[in-house]
């Protein structure tokens, strides 16, 4: 809702168990990156990795900014060419509403 209000729409992504099992390790608690996965799943892997360090019942969010953090096209709306600042507006709105 905060993202929608400031023009930075977002949605919750899944944390698939089938990807988490690819992050199992014989020498570490968890691998940072899943074995045998391409870049397409990195955002999901990041969320799964972070979840390992959050206690049950504690609300948390993985805000992945790799995709929208840089706009290489022409300026449009408040999007300038270059660094976008996504999700700064969303986080500020969320803080202002709390």
Q: Which residues are covered by each model-predicted region?
A:
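A generic structural signal for tightly packed, nonpolar segments enriched in small/aliphatic residues
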Residues: 1-98
């Amino acid at each position: 809702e905060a993202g929608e209000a400031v023009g930075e729409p977002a949605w919750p992504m899944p944390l698939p168990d089938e990807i988490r099992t690819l992050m199992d390790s014989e020498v570490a608690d968890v691998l940072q990156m899943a074995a045998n996965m391409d870049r397409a799943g990195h955002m999901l892997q990041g969320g799964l990795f972070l979840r390992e360090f959050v206690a049950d019942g504690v609300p948390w969010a993985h805000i992945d900014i790799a995709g929208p953090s840089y706009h290489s096209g022409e300026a449009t709306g408040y999007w300038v060419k270059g660094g976008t600042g996504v999700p700064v507006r969303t986080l500020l709105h969320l803080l202002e509403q709390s």
